[in-house]
Amino acid sequence: MFCMDRCVSACMAISDMADFSESGPIPTFCDSRIPGWVGSGVDAIIVSEGRDSDAARALYDALSVRGCRVHLIASNVSMLANRTDGAYVEVPSGLDSTEAVAFVLGTLCAIVSDMGLFDARSALRDSASSVAQDRLEVLEAIDGEIIGVYSTTDVRAASRRWADLIKEKIGIPSFSGELPEFDHNELVGWSDPNVHSPGLGIVVLRSCPDGSMPSIIVGHMLEVLEENGRAVTIVDIGSGTPLERDIRSMILGEAAVRRSV
């Protein structure tokens, strides 16, 4: 999947689902560079919800030359409708970012299900129904001059959506990171606020501790930050499948941003 705009978190949610389902990876690429292994026989999905149709066309042409079967989700697909041999869906105009992410996520689930990779439709329906029964905690306002948002690698879409929302709605720089890989060392490197960017606000989207190695590493990392006086906002995203936690995180992110603007 290729996406370079505000809907990238929807693509990353599909990647999280695919990893969990063990059907085979469905990676998300956030720029127009095409990996060398992408070629004949590969299904490629382009998500171009923004208005840069030239970029979508160039990427489409490059993938087609390589022999890929290209599926397109875009704001203007009319120029490609008579050329693509894959699915094509037009994103309605006038959607805000939350609506656009939801639309693209649902569309991607339909495309992935129709490919026969795994039942993404049912996974989305079940996850949405489960999260709808939650009693989510009201979060405090986000504080900081720049915000780093971290989640574990199984819910990458969660931290990316938070970072995108903060940049869009609050208007301050924000970045996302994945734990417990290299970003564990990065986060510990932020531990002393007197030395490393006192204006940095850190948000950790924490799944319910389950005794796994990632959970243990995240716990120790938070202890190090606390011992060194670095304030961290810990957001409980509960348990359940990666998609459930991704959706729950996105809802909590919307609430946190509203309290901060």
Give, region by region, the residue ranges found by the protein language model.
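C-terminal active-site/capping subdomain that shapes the small-molecule cofactor and substrate pocket
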Residues: 197-261
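A generic structural motif
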Residues: 26-33, 73-75, 172-184, 230-240
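Glycine-rich, charge-decorated loop segments at or immediately adjacent to ligand/cofactor-binding or catalytic sites
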Residues: 78-86, 185-191, 242-243, 247
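Structural motif
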Residues: 45-47, 148-150, 201-205
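Active-site phosphate/pyrophosphate-binding segments
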Residues: 113-199
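Conserved active-site and cofactor/substrate-binding residues in soluble primary-metabolism enzymes
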Residues: 8, 12, 99, 103, ...
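Glycine-rich phosphate-binding loops that contact phosphosugars or nucleotide phosphates
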Residues: 1-130, 140, 206-212, 219-228
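Short, hydrophobic/amphipathic alpha-helical patches that form generic packing surfaces
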Residues: 12-15, 106-113, 164, 168, ...
